[in-house]
Amino acid sequence: MVFFLVMSALSNAGKSHGGTIRTVVILYMFSTVLAAVIAVFASMIFPVEMVLQEAADTAASAPQGIVEVLSTLLMNVVANPVSALVNAKYIGILSWAVLLGVAFRGAKDTTKAALTDISEAISKVVTTIINLAPFGILGLVYTSVTTSGLETFTTYGKLLVLLVGCMLGIYFITNPLLVYWCIRKNPYPLIFKCLKQSAITAFFTRSSAANIPVNMKICEEMGLDKDTYSVTIPLGATINMDGAAITITVMTMATVQTLGIPVDIPTAIILSLLAALAACGASGVAGGSLLLIPMACSLFGISDTVSMQVVAVGFIIGVIQDSVETALNSSSDLLLSASAEFRQWRLQGKEIKF
């Protein structure tokens, strides 16, 4: 799933269609990386630990510094692609998906369509499996409560507060800075317009794709160039994944802190970049950001047995987490698309109205 989602997303990203679209893509990628970086440092400042089974063995074999992390990363990047798929070496899968995705950008439209169809088919299979998640969640909650008592729910609450806090911080603090850089005026009227007209709808639909028509209608009402937003809004639903980057990073950091694995600044930066890149493949399936957590955990030598427990914890808090994540992702598509075009207006001396 990771392989085809990321490869399809990058191959269909296409080439720049002008200065505005180039600016939008830069804003998308920068905001996603920034979200991951902020999530890492927020997790360091407000550490949260979870209750995980079979954690001791993983902690004993985990890397103890940046040298071991880089060694693991390098060996996984150059892993045989077939071996990476068979043995679930997520970093190797991601590296090959990126290389092939970029290579396929010059392929025929029929080839790109085939990649999209395959990724959608795999997504449907995974979605069917996810629909059975409540049964697994029931078992996980039962095991956690019988092992650790009702205080388990306090841990889940702290984790949820950290996730939502990071997402709100991105939307109300860092995104306004990006908007101000574009328009050189008070960004909050535009921030709240996108919040009211786009984020609320996305919160309840929990689907960036379903919110595309809403965002395009708002762009039309603001008088934006249709040739631009008809490209940037659907593209944003694929690669602008601030919320997904936060989810992957926070959940991975919580796992690392639970296992007592040390994380220095260089390792944190690598995790941020990896999470931002992985987030590009999170749009193809409901709860996609949670399913990419094992890939980030593999950077620290954490086994699938442990990382999939973390995914299960994510599904427990997923109703709120996924809703807020989608609201951030989709409203940011609108916000950054509009900001990039308003920047062009400002440079041309046109009046900016929103």
Task: Walk through the language-model features, giving the residues of each.
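Transmembrane alpha-helical segments and their short flanking loops
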Residues: 51, 250-354
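Active-site-adjacent helical/loop segments in soluble small-molecule enzymes
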Residues: 1-5
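Signature of multi-pass transmembrane helix bundles
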Residues: 19-189, 350-354
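Juxtamembrane helix-boundary/capping and inter-helix hinge elements in multi-pass membrane proteins
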Residues: 9-19, 105-110, 148, 184-187, ...
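Hydrophobic transmembrane alpha-helical segments of multi-pass transport and channel proteins
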Residues: 29-33, 37, 164-169, 202-207, ...
